[in-house]
């Protein structure tokens, strides 16, 4: 099994593309959802955040107040790095657990929905394939203005706050162009899924794990049938 990192930009159509992958039966892990999950009360990251940033980052119900925490780290790289040092290891642990579940269920690949895949680069080394949902800037701007009822200035400000899609497209192994008709984009998704399903890149890991399990089973057999009876 191998990992596919999927990203896009605001109003590029990433959510719609993910829905198509899910309809095709693909395994999808939303890293943003996972990041919110690991800071829930009772989890190690939640405890460490309170220890480091204080109880003022808590809501009345004990959840992390994301706005207050965001304000605390805004324009403060040291604090942001400290928060990342708390949350990123926990996110990776959850990612590994979820990925292993899909491995046991026989999936050939797992898609990780990672909004900041190329900005942070933290998870890039784990990705066998990278995919960007792209659209040209004029299309992106028009969609964002229509979807969020924004004027041109505000929409441009939101787009400019992100890494340009053209830059992401240059860094990605696969580009799904969502600039035109949705039927064309959907066809691209189906073709990419077919390509990934046919890939043999999942075999080395699966073979290695199965070999390891076979070795453990053989050892247990020897212990129970030959060594333990004479102990």
From Swiss-Prot:
Residue sites binding ATP per the record: 8-15
Any one annotated GO CC term: membrane
UniProt keyword Nucleotide-binding present: yes
SUPFAM superfamilies: P-loop containing nucleoside triphosphate hydrolases (SSF52540)
Keywords (A to Z) from UniProt: ATP-binding, Nucleotide-binding
GO molecular function: ATP binding; dephospho-CoA kinase activity
Domain named DPCK: residues: 3-207
InterPro entries cross-referenced by the UniProt entry: Depp_CoAkinase (IPR001977), P-loop_NTPase (IPR027417)
Biological process, per Gene Ontology: coenzyme A biosynthetic process
Protein's UniProt keywords contain Nucleotide-binding: yes
Domain of life: Eukaryota
CDD domains associated with the record: DPCK
Gene3D superfamilies, sorted: P-loop containing nucleotide triphosphate hydrolases
Record's protein name: Dephospho-CoA kinase domain-containing protein
């Amino acid at each position: 099994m191998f990992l596919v990192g999927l990203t896009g930009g605001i109003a590029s159509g990433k959510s719609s593309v993910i829905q198509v992958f899910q309809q095709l039966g693909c395994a999808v892990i939303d890293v943003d959802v996972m990041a919110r999950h690991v800071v829930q009360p009772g989890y190690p990251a939640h405890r460490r955040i309170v220890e480091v940033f204080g109880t003022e980052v808590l809501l009345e119900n004990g959840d992390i107040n994301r706005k207050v925490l965001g304000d605390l780290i805004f324009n403060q790289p040291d604090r942001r790095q400290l928060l990342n040092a708390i949350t990123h290891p926990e996110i990776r642990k959850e990612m590994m657990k979820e990925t292993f579940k899909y491995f046991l269920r026989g999936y050939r690949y797992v898609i990780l929905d990672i909004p900041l895949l190329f900005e942070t680069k933290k998870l890039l080394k784990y990705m066998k394939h990278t995919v960007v949902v792209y659209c040209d800037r004029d299309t992106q701007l028009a969609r964002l203005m229509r979807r969020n009822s924004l004027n041109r200035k505000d929409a441009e400000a939101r787009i400019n706050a992100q890494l340009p899609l053209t830059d992401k497209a240059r860094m990605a192994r696969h580009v799904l162009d969502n600039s035109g008709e949705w039927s064309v984009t959907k066809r691209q998704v189906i073709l990419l899924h077919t390509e990934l399903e046919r890939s043999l890149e999942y075999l080395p890991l699966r073979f290695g794990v199965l070999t390891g399990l076979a070795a453990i089973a053989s050892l247990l057999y020897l212990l129970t049938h030959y060594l333990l009876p004479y102990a």
